[in-house]
């Protein structure tokens, strides 16, 4: 047969495959959460061999690049009760806050997966090995209902608007000014399972400059936008130089900085923001301390 014939056959095969991929339905909420559960179940079984992954799948744990199947994959021994999902069908990404057992001990996990052509191409995780965090999340049992509400289409903000509002939260922290970000009067913040916004609330607490020991929040990676529930999730690096020795809080005067902050360190934070009526209503975070200057393998290195 002629060379032209084989070229036509090859072109037809390529076109058919392309059309098949185009006709494949998008990975919706159920699909994304299915991938997440499949991943977590495989982790507990210590067996990634049957996971649908791309040939170049990238896996990190606490900002260290590992081979899929290493790290927590070798020590996870069961799933907990608390399970919270953030779904972004438009970008093919899904995030998770939840509890697990590691060799019988309770831990918490922030995890993000990227799905491309029905295969996992990225898996990024932060592990919180704290029995207290595990216990508090297990006691809660389930996410706050406000994080599970499907917001009417007419009341939804765009992806750009949601991300911009969440970013103002970090600006407010860096500036020590709660008025920089649009906080709802009922805003609460939970970190590693514990409410940390205190009696003052999200905005007024920042005005005390209690977070002035945080030198810089960078990079700020907004990765999952759950438009249906108006939630933004990402991973963010809090960097602390350790050179702030005291704080001058309005109305409280000068007082010493807590000892734990008087050293250089960074904190990798998986954080979610529920936005309602253009304001931050709820902040949830799981975080772990890292050496100062730590960088995510998912961020281009300088």
Where is each model-derived feature located?
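Domain-scale selection of a single, long terminal region
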Residues: 3, 17-18
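Bacterial N-terminal signal peptides that target proteins for export
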Residues: 1-8
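C-terminal and inter-domain tail/linker signature
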Residues: 21-302
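Bacterial N-terminal signal peptides
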Residues: 8-17
């Amino acid at each position: 047969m002629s060379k032209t014939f084989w070229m036509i056959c090859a072109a037809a095969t390529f076109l058919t495959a392309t059309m098949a991929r185009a006709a494949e339905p998008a990975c919706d909420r159920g699909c994304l959460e299915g991938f997440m559960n499949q991943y977590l179940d495989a982790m507990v079984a210590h067996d990634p061999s049957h996971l649908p992954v791309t040939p170049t799948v990238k896996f990190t744990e606490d900002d260290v690049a590992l081979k899929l199947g290493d790290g927590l994959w070798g020590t996870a021994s069961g799933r907990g009760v608390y399970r919270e999902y953030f779904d972004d069908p438009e970008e093919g990404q899904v995030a998770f806050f939840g509890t697990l057992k590691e060799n019988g001990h309770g831990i918490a996990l922030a995890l993000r997966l990227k799905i491309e052509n029905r295969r996992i191409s990225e898996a990024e995780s932060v592990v919180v090995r704290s029995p207290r965090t595990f216990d508090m999340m297990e006691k809660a049992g389930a996410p706050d209902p406000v994080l599970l509400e499907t917001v009417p289409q007419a009341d939804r903000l765009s992806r750009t608007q949601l991300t911009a509002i969440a970013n103002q939260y970090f600006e407010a922290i860096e500036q020590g000014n709660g008025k920089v970000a649009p906080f709802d009067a009922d805003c609460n913040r939970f970190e590693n399972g514990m409410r940390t916004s205190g009696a003052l609330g999200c905005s007024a607490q920042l005005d005390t400059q209690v977070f002035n020991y945080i030198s810089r929040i960078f990079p700020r990676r907004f990765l999952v936008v759950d438009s249906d529930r108006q939630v933004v999730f990402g991973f963010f690096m809090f960097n602390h130089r350790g050179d702030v020795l005291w704080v001058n809080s309005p109305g409280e005067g000068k007082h010493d900085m807590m000892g734990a902050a008087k050293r250089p360190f960074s904190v990798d934070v998986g954080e979610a923001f529920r936005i309602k009526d253009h304001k931050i209503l709820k902040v949830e975070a799981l975080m772990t301390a890292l050496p100062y200057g730590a960088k995510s393998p998912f961020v281009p290195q300088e």
